[in-house]
Amino acid sequence: NRIEGYEIPELIEVHCTDNDQTVEVQYISHHNNMIRTDLQGIPLHFNHLKRNIYVANFSGREFVMKL
């Protein structure tokens, strides 16, 4: 799976900016400027912010993905 030349791994580390923790999400798919992932059964949709940075929000928390 590739987006604009970036290889997308099956498991992706994302950083929660609210509690300063890093967690792994499972890649599901991508479409346009969004990447769908799964965090322990919870769907997270990361939107492209800039360059290789994607951001998702869930339950009041922000998650950042760098590819």
Model-found features: residue ranges?
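Cysteine-centric segments in proteins
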Residues: 1-67
